[in-house]
Amino acid sequence: MDALEITQKLISYPTITPKECGIFEYIKSLFPAFKTLECEKNGVKNLFLYRIFNPLKKHAEKEHAKEKHVKENVKPLHFCFAGHIDVVPPGNNWQSDPFKPIIKEGFLYGRGAQDMKGGVGAFLSASLNFNPKTPFLLSILLTSDEEGPGIFGTRLMLEKLKEKDLLPHMAIVAEPTCEKVLGDSIKIGRRGSINGKLILKGVQGHVAYPQKCQNPIDTLASVLPLISGVHLDNGDECFDPSKLVITNLHAGLGANNVTPGSVEIAFNARHSLKTTQESLKEYLEKVLKDLPYTLELESSSSPFITASHSKLTSVLQENILKTCHTTPLLNTKGGTSDARFFSAHGIEVVEFGAINDRIHAVDERVSLKELELLEKVFLGVLEGLSEK
């Protein structure tokens, strides 16, 4: 089965987060030779398929056991394709049923075509066509909760794999990373994300007696240039400068003759490795010195980076250039993804997938040529890793 046929089938399942709708049974049916692990919690389902190709024979393992570095010698390279089968709600005004895929003018239309059932379909097809000659462990990790909170999705599945000593060495998450043409972008990392709530305190009172009030909005005006849209560091070759962005402001009771007793500022900082929750706290404490305030900070994800010269990145680059005739840009732009959970376990991880011009949009679609090329790239990566 090719990537197009598999992707069409995947799109036909209305897997709006966290619904799985039986899609895992279909996927399992494609891989009868793979072992299966499943994990379900709080309505979220996760699937892990794996197969050891050309396993080391027992007598060889005994010989390896005599060697100093037994662990590295006995275990074959473990590579994992990862992704999510859940999609966001389709909304209205589609030209066709979002869960009845159609082909029109060289494109496959349907919810999830780009994000990310197209990528999943491509790596499933590549996995079916992979036949290495050396010992190699190939796995596939899928979750029904990436578009949602993600608490019981990939993160939980990786914890289970750690318990079973089945964590991969390398992984590609098939997120739609490309901007204009397939192959123009690889995500080799992601910025971290810190959410915050700042409350500046004042004294509520009658607007006609300002001398008896202390308006916190006046206080905010004096420090706003130092907390709105400011760069927290200079970035580096892999990351843009970390930036503090205000997302919401709230003050007052809704009455025109009452000054507020406080003003609440919600903000987010997307940050590089140069900025941490502690350094952000220190910066704000310095800016807000001597002012009455309360501050809450919470990190929702940590930044990570996979070296541009790593084995996985190099093999992926080589196959993109060979198949797509494009030199990919290595970057860390965009929001958070499940790749961060792999990185937290020390797994070498990158993201690569379809063009992202219609993700989460009406009439989402992926070109048929993209699916064909994406499958070839993924198969080339498998073959390249198994030969090196």
Curated annotation (Swiss-Prot):
Enzyme class: hydrolase
Keywords on record: Amino-acid biosynthesis, Cobalt, Diaminopimelate biosynthesis, Hydrolase, Lysine biosynthesis, Metal-binding, Zinc
Cofactor field: Zn(2+); Co(2+)
GO molecular function: acetylornithine deacetylase activity; metal ion binding; succinyl-diaminopimelate desuccinylase activity
GO biological process assignments: diaminopimelate biosynthetic process; L-arginine biosynthetic process; lysine biosynthetic process via diaminopimelate
Family annotation (CDD domains): M20_DapE_proteobac
Comment on bound cofactor: Binds 2 Zn(2+) or Co(2+) ions per subunit.
Enzyme Commission code: 3.5.1.18
One Pfam family this sequence matches: Peptidase_M20
Endpoints of the signal sequence: none
Active site location: 86, 146 (proton acceptor)
The reaction(s) this protein catalyses: N-succinyl-(2S,6S)-2,6-diaminopimelate + H2O = (2S,6S)-2,6-diaminopimelate + succinate
Binding site for Zn(2+) 1: 84, 115, 175
Keyword Signal on entry: no
Pathway named in the protein's UniProt entry: Amino-acid biosynthesis; L-lysine biosynthesis via DAP pathway; LL-2,6-diaminopimelate from (S)-tetrahydrodipicolinate (succinylase route): step 3/3
Superkingdom in the source lineage: Bacteria
Residues given in the record as Zn(2+) 2 binding sites: 115, 147, 360
Keyword Amino-acid biosynthesis: yes
Function text: Catalyzes the hydrolysis of N-succinyl-L,L-diaminopimelic acid (SDAP), forming succinate and LL-2,6-diaminopimelate (DAP), an intermediate involved in the bacterial biosynthesis of lysine and meso-diaminopimelic acid, an essential component of bacterial cell walls.
Subunit organization: Homodimer.
Recorded family membership: Belongs to the peptidase M20A family. DapE subfamily.
Name the record gives this protein: Succinyl-diaminopimelate desuccinylase
Encoding gene per record: dapE
